[in-house]
């Protein structure tokens, strides 16, 4: 056979033998690796937690009182301050006796917030013409802290419109809170003598 052909065949045989050796080494390396299916599973956990708080309660403590009013031929107003319980009179009418704000007391959980819904006005009825109680507002005290927007009366707290709701946070360690309410009574001209009564509705719920 020609010399060149013999050299070519020799090279082919050498390359074939080298490839066989590399293939054998690769197979041996694969056999020494642990099977992927044998790896252990990985697990993690999360904590499930729930906090149960005391339900909100609210009870009546005292009524809103405007004292004794002496009417005149012209109308006037008597306003009970929601923070102090003091009375302010406008017009020719006279007011005698002690005024007081309405007070409610409740219990909840410290640092939780609640929303208050308070009516804006109500009627006082009696033997004469109905008197309107308006500007019903919530006062400040040391058991609660108001959050959210301020209102239009300049005090920064309270409610000036029915349907609006103010939020407060209970800040006492015991969870006891107080809500004081004042308002303005519109006395008609020559209001008939007698006792006049109305009602104020307030609602609180956790937020």
Each model region followed by its residue ranges:
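Short, surface-exposed beta-strand/strand-loop-strand elements in extracellular ectodomains
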Residues: 132-141
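Sec/Tat signal peptide C-region and signal peptidase I cleavage site
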Residues: 31-37
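Bacterial N-terminal signal peptides
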Residues: 18-30
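Serine/threonine-rich, low-complexity intrinsically disordered segments
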Residues: 8-10, 18, 34, 152, ...
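N-terminal secretory signal peptides that target proteins for export/translocation
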Residues: 1-15
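N-terminal small/polar-rich segments of proteins
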Residues: 37-127, 167-207
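Acidic, glycine-rich flexible loop segments
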Residues: 140-185
């Amino acid at each position: 056979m020609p010399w060149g052909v013999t050299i070519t065949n020799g090279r082919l045989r050498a390359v074939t033998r080298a490839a066989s050796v590399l293939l054998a080494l690769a197979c041996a390396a694969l056999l020494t690796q642990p099977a992927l299916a044998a790896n252990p599973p990985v697990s993690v956990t999360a904590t499930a937690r729930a906090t149960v708080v005391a339900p909100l309660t609210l009870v009546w403590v005292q009524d809103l009182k405007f004292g004794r009013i002496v009417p005149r031929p012209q109308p006037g107003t008597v306003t009970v301050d929601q923070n102090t319980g003091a009375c302010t009179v406008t017009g020719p009418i006279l007011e005698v006796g002690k005024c007081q704000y309405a007070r409610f007391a409740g219990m909840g959980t410290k640092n939780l917030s609640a929303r208050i819904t308070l009516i804006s006005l109500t009627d006082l009825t009696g033997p004469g013409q109905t008197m309107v109680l308006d500007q019903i507002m919530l006062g400040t005290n040391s058991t609660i802290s108001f959050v959210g927007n301020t209102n239009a009366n300049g005090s920064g707290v309270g409610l000036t419109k029915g349907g609006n709701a103010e939020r407060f946070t209970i800040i006492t360690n015991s969870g006891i809170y107080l809500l004081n309410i004042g308002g303005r009574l519109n006395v008609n001209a020559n209001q008939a003598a007698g006792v006049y009564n109305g009602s104020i509705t307030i609602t609180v719920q956790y937020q």
